[in-house]
């Protein structure tokens, strides 16, 4: 892993990376006059590091088209719902789980997908579901999905990408043997 870049200077991932001797960088949205300016800085940083794959985890910024175009089918995101449900602008963090509970779904989960110019609309790599229990709160459901889905799916998807086993065909991602 060549670097960990965070939008939040207090992200625990930065501390973990430092302890592992991995270079860290913070690209905070508020440090730039616009999303586009932040994206330009981020793309320049990633290209300078010769990055092949960008992995988003808890990155609460919708990427601009410039970023997506700079890394086509090379940005993975984990979303805390079964896309296409509870996805798109405004569906992040606890909001996703609040909406799932309000809707009365029986299953929720996580999706790892390639990032496209449509928010949460890229080709799906993998999904995993958990049961929604009668006494769930948004916080309890969020924790169950993180531990049982997100934390398992994302490393698996990264591994498959690094092994050259993901093939994007339109909206479909095939996992090669």
Q: What is each residue range found by the language model?
A:
Residues 1-177:
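One-carbon transfer enzymes
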